[in-house]
Structure formats: structure tokens, C-alpha cells
Amino acid sequence: MDLAGICSSFQSDLDFCPDCGSVLPLPGVQDAVACTRCGFSINVRDFEGKVVKTSVVFNKLGTAMPLSMEEGPEFQGPVVDRRCSRCGHEGMAYHTRQMRSADEGQTVFYTCTNCKFQEKEDS
């Protein structure tokens, strides 16, 4: 590979664009490989003899963590000073969702950190 005539920001392997550092796509049937970010082009012949290996790794069945109530999004996030209407505990976690049309406010879901009771408020 002769990159002597190429003015580049840094020196790189053929896997990366020498101008912007992006990963270059794999060579295809075209005569050149072009960077999808900056448009830098390199002749496909420069890739001759280069070996490309790929592998796919799958997680074993059953290795994913089971979802429990404490791990859901309604139990994560900030806690505000709000009294639970069911148990009277002071302190509720909250998260927001856009449940209605985009020109209306969000819906705030409050979850009691003590009894897990959930309330909602349209803002």
C-alpha cells in the first residue's frame, strides 16, 4: 500500500480513514472504498491479501438478570418530598412519559419508595 502521496491528519491502518479516523466499510465490488463520514477514498486494490474475520457471540440462555419490581424504571431516578396517599410515607421516586400528544404536557408517575404504590399527575 502506497500512501506516500496522501496528505492525511494521521497515519492509520486500512481499517480506519486516515483523514477523520472513522472505520472504513469493507471493500465491495466498487473500485474504491469511500469513508461514509468525510468522503475520503482509497483504491480497493490496497486491500488485497487483507484477511477479515468476524464472529458473533451469543449470551447463554438464562444469564440475563431477571427483572424484579425494584429494577424497573419507576423505582429508579430522583426521589422527591411527596407524601404517598396510601401509606403516608414521605418520599416518592418519579419518572416522566409523554403519554398524550406532543403539544400537551408530560405525565409524571410517582412511586412510593415504601409500599410501591403508584400515582400519576398530568403536568
Curated annotation (Swiss-Prot):
Coiled coil: none annotated. One of its GO terms (molecular function) is DNA-directed RNA polymerase activity. A zinc finger (TFIIS-type) spans 80-120. GO terms for cellular component: RNA polymerase I complex. PROSITE patterns: RNA_POL_M_15KD (PS01030), ZF_TFIIS_1 (PS00466), ZF_TFIIS_2 (PS51133). It comes from the Eukaryota. Core component of RNA polymerase I (Pol I), a DNA-dependent RNA polymerase which synthesizes ribosomal RNA precursors using the four ribonucleoside triphosphates as substrates. Can mediate Pol I proofreading of the nascent RNA transcript. Anchors into the Pol I active site to monitor transcription fidelity and cleave mis-incorporated 5'-ribonucleotides. Belongs to the archaeal RpoM/eukaryotic RPA12/RPB9/RPC11 RNA polymerase family. The TFIIS-type zinc-binding beta-ribbon domain contains an acidic hairpin motif (residues Asp-103, Glu-104) that likely coordinates the nucleophilic water and magnesium to cleave the scissile phosphodiester bond and release the mis-incorporated 5'-ribonucleotides. This is DNA-directed RNA polymerase I subunit RPA12.
